[in-house]
Amino acid sequence: MAIYHLTAKTGSRSGGQSARAKADYIQREGKYARDMDEVLHAESGHMPEFVERPADYWDAADLYERANGRLFKEVEFALPVELTLDQQKALASEFAQHLTGAERLPYTLAIHAGGGENPHCHLMISERINDGIERPAAQWFKRYNGKTPEKGGAQKTEALKPKAWLEQTREAWADHANRALERAGHDARIDHRTLEAQGIERLPGVHLGPNVVEMEGRGIRTDRADVALNIDTANAQIIDLQEYREAIDHERNRQSEEIQRHQRVSGADRTAGPEHGDTGRRSPAGHEPDPAGQRGAGGGVAESPAPDRGGMGGAGQRVAGGSRRGEQRRAERPERVAGVALEAMANRDAGFHDAYGGAADRIVALARPDATDNRGRLDLAALGGPMKNDRTLQAIGRQLKAMGCERFDIGVRDATTGQMMNREWSAAEVLQNTPWLKRMNAQGNDVYIRPAEQERHGLVLVDDLSEFDLDDMKAEGREPALVVETSPKNYQAWVKVADAAGGELRGQIARTLASEYDADPASADSRHYGRLAGFTNRKDKHTTRAGYQPWVLLRESKGKTATAGPALVQQAGQQIEQAQRQQEKARRLASLELPERQLSRHRRTALDEYRSEMAGLVKRFGDDLSKCDFIAAQKLASRGRSAEEIGKAMAEASPALAERKPGHEADYIERTVSKVMGLPSVQLARAELARAPAPRQRGMDRGGPDFSM
């Protein structure tokens, strides 16, 4: 969304600055040319006659400007991300003309991409007024001669000096940007005023800047980004608290109206009751209604104790000499209505605190005076404590504890390329680097976890489960050590089968469980990543129309070994031994060296078969296209198709492959085919197919064994 950011700096020779170096930097020229792709647009204006290219002017400023003179004024401002590049160019040029056009001050501007999420503009302005008089470079920067301007240097503007100039510039930028957003049809707006002046109850944000964005993009954690993320989190919770407060006020008003309505209908607001003939008008005794709306009926009025926060506590007032039935009605009906309402509100209170436990404390802590230094800047050290109750940290901590490993592989999948960035961390390092992981997730990347490669463990991942599958697993002694909800009603389970089990055993158990519970077979191996709780699922198919992604939630974290764990390990060992015997048999059969052409004698192409298989599988499994790919490839491989044939068929016929696996389609195909070709059942089927005579092979081709799940 559009954000407001504008800063102004002065570059002077006395301060050690160089105008040429600054111009080279913002235009990515000279020694900065290696990063020239960062510059989306550059332009200059109001340059004097001696200038052939903008660098000449800023070179001359370094050479000829007086020792105590100011070389340039730099204005840096964030461009609205909602605008296209052409719209951003037009906006930056328009604003530059606003600041320089009246006196024709020479300027150079450059728009930087800022990693795609932080587009911004650097504007360098010279204080020398271009009055149209032609002067050489050496004369241009001399002292101005008011009597004979052509003999002196260019006059300096006074407009950039007053302190009011910065406030005027900040306001002008907000006006220009908002007009551009309005012209482009966007509802977003920016405001140059302080949050207090706007009447907004939230913490001021921190501008990251291009260097921080670049470092974070390369996987380098920065304190400034951590602070910005903490503030964003706190502000989101402030908004939640404000909405909750408004909801409570609304509920109280509604319940108050409900109570009054009950009183009017039942007559409980009448002190004498209906048998005394009270019609709601002035009583015969002439008593006026009391402030609480109760009426006297003769005799004195005794105040009952004030109600506590938990309920009404009574009928409000007791009237001496009133009807016993009326008094009983007053004592019961309004109290019952109010009691139910307030009990419901109390339950909502409890639910809110469960969801936002510690949020208010953190917000107050973030806003406290000692969170800033004596210059009003945020103190990084002071912000560590307030986030100790962060719910993402809590979820991560519980997941790490339930997994029970010493070291973990953390994977961050790049949203654009699909490549995985890996980090091997201890549990403490994972928690320490949570702010950086949040930043990566906020930029559209998914966050994953698995035990480190050298870690001795007995965890097996079962992916793509339903609630019914989880219930069946628990009933059959395969209860998970932890359960993660990756998207609404879709779960991953880590099953602990032993304190330590080899990778081959874990892989076999994963395939067994995936087959028994109709889970994702493509994820059934010993090294597959699972989701890390506390972050959002950034896959496009889970994004709502409003642009929201579901949170990855930790549903269970018992960390216990499954009851059937030892039996699963034993069964897997037997299956591995059987597979090894089958592979040995397949090798002996392969030694017969039947012609390869006998394996591939098919009347239909691999592409035809793949499309035919996918048509039935998609009807069966719906949107789970990865499972369809895996089973289709398994069937083709069992019929003798080569890995190359299967890969080509998958590349051409797999539905929406580019949208599902953007940037890593080839890697996905290679991994899927490799897993399929390594299955013992596939190897045995291929060996038997190779041994069979040609007619037998064609018969199997038409019918073929069914390896579907």
From Swiss-Prot:
Cofactor: Mg(2+); Mn(2+); Ca(2+); Ba(2+)
Biased composition, class Basic and acidic residues, residue ranges: 251-261, 272-290, 324-336, 698-709
Molecular-function GO terms, alphabetical: DNA binding; DNA topoisomerase type I (single strand cut, ATP-independent) activity; metal ion binding; transferase activity
Active site: 25
High-level lineage: Bacteria, Pseudomonadati, Pseudomonadota, Gammaproteobacteria, Enterobacterales
Effect of residue 32 to F: No decrease in conjugal transfer frequency
Annotated stretches, region: DNA primase: 315-709
Gene3D superfamilies from the UniProt entry: 1.10.1240.50, 3.30.930.30, RepB DNA-primase, N-terminal domain (3.30.70.1790), Single helix bin (1.20.5.460)
The EC number(s) this enzyme carries: 5.6.2.1, 2.7.7.101
Coiled coil: 567-594
Complex and partners: Interacts with MobB and MobC to form the relaxosome.
Annotated stretches, region: DNA relaxase: 2-186
Pfam families referenced in this protein's UniProt entry, alphabetically: MobA_MobL (PF03389), RepB_primase (PF16793), RepB_primase_C (PF22448)
UniProt main location, coarse: cytoplasm
A cellular component term, taken from the record's GO annotations: DNA-directed RNA polymerase complex
Organism for this UniProt entry: Escherichia coli
Compartments in which it is found: Cytoplasm
Similarity-based family: Belongs to the MobA/MobL family.
Highest taxon in the source lineage: Bacteria
Consequence of substituting residue 74 to A: 50% decrease in conjugal transfer frequency. 10-fold decrease in conjugal transfer frequency and great reduction in the rate of DNA cleavage
Residues annotated as site: Involved in DNA binding: 70
Region annotation Disordered: where it falls in the sequence: 1-21, 251-337, 689-709
Catalysed reaction equations from the record: ATP-independent breakage of single-stranded DNA, followed by passage and rejoining; ssDNA + n NTP = ssDNA/pppN(pN)n-1 hybrid + (n-1) diphosphate
Function per UniProt: Part of the relaxosome complex that is responsible for plasmid transfer during conjugation. Locally unwinds DNA and catalyzes the cleavage of one of the DNA strands at oriT. The cleaved strand is then transferred through the dedicated type IV secretion apparatus. MobA remains covalently linked at the 5' end of the strand, and once in the recipient cell, it probably catalyzes the rejoining of the two ends of the strand, re-forming the circular plasmid DNA.
Protein name: Mobilization protein A
Note describing how the cofactor binds: Divalent metal cation. Can use Mg(2+), or to a lesser extent, Mn(2+), Ca(2+) or Ba(2+).
Keywords, ordered alphabetically: Calcium, Coiled coil, Conjugation, Cytoplasm, DNA-binding, DNA-directed RNA polymerase, Isomerase, Magnesium, Manganese, Metal-binding, Mobility protein, Multifunctional enzyme, Plasmid, Topoisomerase, Transcription, Transferase
